[in-house]
Amino acid sequence: MSCLPALDKFLQNYHQSYLSTLGELPRYYPRGESSLCIQGEFVEASTEAVGWLPVKREQPGSFTNVEHALELKLWPDIHSFYGQYFAAPVLFDSTWGTGELLQVWNEADFDALQQNIIGHLMMKQKLKQPPTWFIGLLDEGDKMLTVDNADGSVWIEIPGELPSVQLATSLAEFIAALSPRIAPPVKHEELPMPAQDHPGIFASFKRMWHNLTGKR
């Protein structure tokens, strides 16, 4: 079963929760990057957070180029999870802790996401580990949330290691178990990360990289 219905429902609930609780849309620091998600005027030089709404892409994003580059068929949910919307990362509460689901802020962010997924999959090949691809972060970036490319199950994974704890048998099941977390936007500091800099996915991965390398 595709994860898209669960993702649709979570994003709808996410924004409704902010409106019901705070009377406003969730806000996000775009760091000068425009997006169709932004509600209201966008000022590139502004350092303020913006209100945003998820926007369905007219042309869904595809990972066919990644599959061709790696000669690897990706679990179909990757197209639904990352290719259907432009959105900011979304926060959640769960029985496993608090976390963040990664999303794509704009087309440049999607291109950068593909590069980082290729890098992650190449690392798995080098380590002779089964392929996975990431969907988010858990516990303030200490752990990655990944999908097992063989069967679509969702796991906790530390970079460089095998997935350690299975959380759900499918991405749809995992998303359905999450609750929106209401929190003010956080302006993340610039941290070194060996990847192209974009505000959505890589702001989150910079935090994860900083947390992980700082504890090794």
UniProtKB/Swiss-Prot annotation:
This is Protein Syd. It holds the Pfam family Syd. It is a peripheral membrane protein. Interacts with the SecY protein in vivo. May bind preferentially to an uncomplexed state of SecY, thus functioning either as a chelating agent for excess SecY in the cell or as a regulatory factor that negatively controls the translocase function. The keyword Cell membrane applies. Signal peptide: none annotated. It comes from the Bacteria. Keywords: Cell inner membrane, Cell membrane, Membrane. One of its GO terms (cellular component) is cytoplasmic side of plasma membrane. The keyword Cell membrane applies. NCBIfam families: PRK04968.1. Its main location: membrane. It is found in: Cell inner membrane. Belongs to the Syd family. It comes from Shewanella oneidensis (strain ATCC 700550 / JCM 31522 / CIP 106686 / LMG 19005 / NCIMB 14063 / MR-1).
